[in-house]
Amino acid sequence: LLYGFGLAVATFIEKYHGTAAAKAMIYYSPLFFLLQFLLVVNFIVIAVKYQYCKLHRWGLMVVHTSFIIILLGALTSFQFGEEGILHIREGESTDQIAVRQGDLTTFHTLPFTVELVKFTLTRYPGSSSPSSYESELLVHVDGKTRHEHVFMNNVLDVKGYRFFQASYDPDEQGTVLSVNRDVAGRNITYTGYLLLVIGLILSLVGKNSRFMA
């Protein structure tokens, strides 16, 4: 319940303050990592206590294993993934992302260039609150140019880097994109999701499921 509440708060923060703020305040906070560790311990204890393997309850066993793998994927992302911020103004291009490590900020060079064509902010009718914001981009990579759009639920993938719409400049002439490069953590997490689907199917149609009993 507390973990779910944390995810809900993170979603709210991400919508109104940007992805970077949600990561700093919730996703990468010590309390959130503690909750994830306790969830892993809880999944293991439940699997042992109810003897899922001994009773051949493979569906539930796979589901619990998938949750553990998903959380391990999140930990791998935190430890080994590269996180940064790309700030760019309309009509400008850059290949530099700002990476913060403690109190120190360094700049890493991307193997391609990103150009901001236009930033668009949409507000709720009769309100100053943003309902969505979108970046229209040109990505110059390997001698070719890609025309891309990044907004709240549309992520850009280029050479292992993922770009998320995070924030924008007060004058609405510039965008802030959250950049993530995390192939290992992402693959572990996707494996966990695949196992989750398999586990749910086994729980429904397996030999010891309620439907087959």
Where are these predicted regions, by residue range?
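Solvent-exposed, non-transmembrane regions of integral membrane proteins
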Residues: 1-213
